[in-house]
């Protein structure tokens, strides 16, 4: 066998030649563990795993007892103490002895945190820290005792003996108490019987576990104590008593004696070690590498880090994030003062400034090695076993924007630990109305957690910002004559040519130009005193400070917010931006057409349709519920009718908000809006369990918000504006009244804020858009403060007993009684409520993750809820479980899916979606198939993962923006070399998981019906192509200008985006796929294009801009080619892509031409004649295809590219697509942007006739 073949084989050590030959002569032999009477050294055998050399690194320092080699001499010295049992470091407070200095520091900061000086925490000098710590440590060379006398414990009593003495002193048996030390000079302990029972003990006992009663060894026979089998067998700290090392000093020490330390009724295949021995052996054997593990600082051999270090800051921010589900073993009735030392780390009364905060929520290293239970939670683990480096891909803290400095201020916020914790949680559940009745506190109780004084850090600031933004649109103006008109609320000004100054988010001090309109304000119809209750807020110091720092410009009527924007006249002809009502009329005509269809569909009892859509009559009452529902694999709608509004509730809303009855929708209209919400919106974003809502005087902002969304789908945007104002005002007042109690914010309030955020993001009102950043920020803060992003089992015990199979396996009758309890109506009802509550919490977090990161992707505002902050589960795989209207239907579906709830763990698993989102992120980063080898993931979870990829794009863009702010080319190179491959890898991992779970990416005639019946597909596919588009181009600056209605900046930004041709070509491929997906889906839906979700509409708008930019580059190239023969020929990829876009646009024009209403012409859209352009509808597709598919580019092909003007045609088709789905007001803003861009292209292009 050659030498090459020997590579990688384990090398066996010749023991006989290395025991003495390799021993350094300078090493003196310390006493051996196995010393006998004749002082002959007994060499212990080398463990089997230690015989193999695992590294080529030289290890010159050898142990003369076991021949182990070490790289450093201090490692050898530490190892030798394992043989000699030397404990030279003494704790001055209690006398406990330790083998290492850092173990003493850990012990003191854990058990004597109140006695340790705080100077070491505040000091930055390492030498000063060491000097302070040395004051509390006594070093005694050669000591082998476990405990020595100290001033506080002069007799060197162990904790068990002290407990025994305290108990007998209480019972009046002081005379019989032996006051001798624990161990005499002959190293034998005195005969003291163990203490039994749960009696109270004095507060002087600080160290031992009150539940662990260690009997002392007999005076003559060195026996070992036994631990009860009910104690945890996974923690190495409970394997033996304090005098474990005495075994090594017995002449007849062998394996049988070592087994005596093992608790009875628990068997182990190998002898158990103490925590110190376990940690040392693991490190020395190479099983654990402390450098690669993300361990807490207290396990470091170099001592604790200073308080100013990053490790100390990181540890202080992670206080109380560990679940407290393992704390139910400590009850208030049987608690003793000794439990301060025996409680889990997260229950210790730790001061925040103390160095012992490193121990809070930090699992023991021994638990890490033994799969211990320090983590707690469901199944023993509620957080990752290790800090997986894959999650670093989503670490946003290093690249955060300045406005995100408050996003994590509540990471250390905790629940209040008081005696009324159960009642407060029940009250929160009642307020949320997620469940119909209070969950019985005897079955579901809250687990206690620690409270800190700084629970609401800087909460006043973000709350005041939200209140301040609420005043922006205080003067709500409605046109009474057009209150019930169909269409957007800003299409009826009497002076449509009025224009407003463009306002940027960074130039908010610029005054708006007020339009001269004759709108009548709602505030004019009520008294000044009544106006205060709806539109004014109580001023405080924080609000006054904000108002003084930044003046809020007064707002005009809603018509001015969406009016055409006026620009500076420098180098720009202002007439090209004077957009008339041609685009607005397109939307109004389409809305009236759709409303007429809805009249025939929803209510045959409607009166004259002409009166319903006229500008002077009121909309008739709607009396019939929506009858059509759509069902599919991911969507199931119940037939139960939802009636949230009654006359009593409507009168209450009118009275509390000081409105007039004729300026508020009727009960039938409000309930009709709820139906529209359920049919059109809820199936795309199901984060509210509608059947659990019980409207009341407190939570009616939620049903108002629901009807607000439905009003948009009913084309009554004026109603939606009024309802949003009422809901926003009531939410703001609720937050003001509960300023000091935000940790108990009800779920219905967060759900209302989510719906309000939807309307603010996708509104064409500048004032509403300005409040989005604050609304998302307050949502994120409330989620973190109320710990909504953590699993529910951390705070509420599942209302189900365990199966007791092991306990009653020999008693089938009792076991059957337990199993029968799982199928009772009461138990099923409790399980259903717990499931709905858990899923509602999870879905709120996922929807906030969705809308906040999409908003960040569009306008580049850093106010998002980040993926790594989502510590809870995922939406359930079987969506129908969340749509069930009652517990009976829910239980039937559980049976249909073969889901059995026979323990709290099974209920927790179902409620958390059978996974957690951190595991999903790990798969997204490394693509490890083991994580999801056989698991099923819901499409809602896959949608959240896709949004996390968008978040990763945002993180990478922000990082490059900070590093290469002024160097565009360097930033582009770094993106292509580092960031883009990482994003592409994540997309590949996501694609594999999506396809494996039945997802569809390739469209065909066979799978189009499946896509249309599953709402998740209609969200996922456009966002998938949008992520690929963003991988190529950074379009966020352009979209930010559009939302600010700054058309000049928009055009300038688009010129920069379309600068690099290769990236633009690839992005255009994905943009064409988005448009093709839309035309494929709507062409088979028979005109039901109103079901196009708003996220898809946004992706369509961005795709239109990209396609138009690419077509303009080709048209400019074709013109330059005709005039300059030196320019290279047009590539075949460009010709294929142009032809693909041409066919898609022709399909769109053909589809939209079938509408029953007359649309504006192409010339009307451009506002100027486009001389020389060709009508694509009259062109022969086969002729164009033959011309462009020729081997050489002819002048005829270039002329076709130039004269078809697909750049302008694309913008025109985009405006017609937006007009075909006129639900959200932002569609009108998008259409104005497309018209502006089309006019800009015409005015900045050479005339075709001049070519």
UniProtKB/Swiss-Prot annotation:
The modification Phosphoserine is found at residues 527, 603. Residues 183-202 have a biased composition (Polar residues). GO terms for molecular function: DNA-binding transcription factor activity, RNA polymerase II-specific; RNA polymerase II cis-regulatory region sequence-specific DNA binding; sequence-specific DNA binding; zinc ion binding. It comes from the Eukaryota. It is found in: Nucleus. Its main location: nucleus. Disruption phenotype: Leads to cell death when overexpressing the camptothecin mimetic TOP1-T(722)A mutant. Keywords: DNA-binding, Metal-binding, Nucleus, Phosphoprotein, Repeat, Transcription, Transcription regulation, Zinc, Zinc-finger. Residues 164-173 have a biased composition (Basic residues). Signal peptide: none annotated. Residues 160-227, 398-428, 617-636 are annotated as: Disordered. Residues 407-428, 617-634 have a biased composition (Low complexity). GO terms for biological process: acetate biosynthetic process; regulation of transcription by RNA polymerase II. SMART domains: ZnF_C2H2. DNA-binding protein that acts probably as a transcription factor. Belongs to the RSF2/TDA9 family. Present with 672 molecules/cell in log phase SD medium. This is Probable transcription factor TDA9. It comes from Saccharomyces cerevisiae (strain ATCC 204508 / S288c) (Baker's yeast). The gene is TDA9.
